[in-house]
Amino acid sequence: MKERTSSTVLLEKQLQTMIEQNMETFFGIRFLKSEYAITSGRMDSIGIDENNSPVIFEYKRSMSENVINQGLFYLDWLLDHKADFKLLVIEKLGMEVADQT
């Protein structure tokens, strides 16, 4: 039996795809990866800004104060895993950009 996808889940995924495909145009952010797996979970979308700093996009169907905690967790993870982020930048944008992170 196939699980039915709700329209809100579909809408969230469509929004994520649209943002990822147009991240640089909309926000000036270079897209790096979708569903970026980390120690305990995943970031919906991750990119890099004009200062070569990471930018995380999370797509939510509803408002929740938990989103702040999630953002703080991601910040803490990035601070503790700078080498992992640098490897992602090397893989997607090359060593020259990664050396500036």
Q: Residue ranges of each PLM-predicted region?
A:
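Charged, terminal alpha-helix-loop-beta segments
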Residues: 1-101
